[in-house]
């Protein structure tokens, strides 16, 4: 039975959503002390891509993804 490397076990699949014509890609990356950094990429066909790294840190990767997605929706609402 193959064993996963520790860095592979911490990787999560990015969450892709759309909001008001923007594409939001929330992702998480392993950080210090077992935390997960909430990262976000925001794309729109008529605007430059916005990349936000380590918006905040969470003990759970799912929480990081949820936070990054919610943060992105607020960002889009503020720019629209």
Language model segments and positions:
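Short, surface-exposed linear segments at secondary-structure transitions and domain or protein termini
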Residues: 34-36, 59-67
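A generic "cationic amphipathic patch" detector
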Residues: 34, 53, 76-77
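A short, exposed loop/beta-hairpin motif centered on an aromatic-Gly-Thr core
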Residues: 49-63
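Short, charged/polar low-complexity linear motifs in solvent-exposed/disordered segments
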Residues: 42-44, 55, 67-70
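Short arginine-rich
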Residues: 70-80
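N-terminal segment of the canonical double-stranded RNA-binding domain
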Residues: 2-39, 43-45
């Amino acid at each position: 039975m193959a064993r996963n490397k520790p860095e592979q076990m911490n990787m999560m699949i990015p969450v892709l959503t759309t909001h008001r014509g923007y594409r939001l890609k929330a992702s998480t990356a392993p950080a210090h002390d077992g935390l997960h950094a909430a990262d976000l990429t925001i794309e729109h066909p008529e605007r430059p891509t916005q990349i936000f790294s380590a918006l905040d840190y969470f003990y759970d990767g799912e929480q990081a993804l949820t936070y990054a997605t919610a943060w992105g929706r607020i960002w889009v609402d503020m720019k629209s």
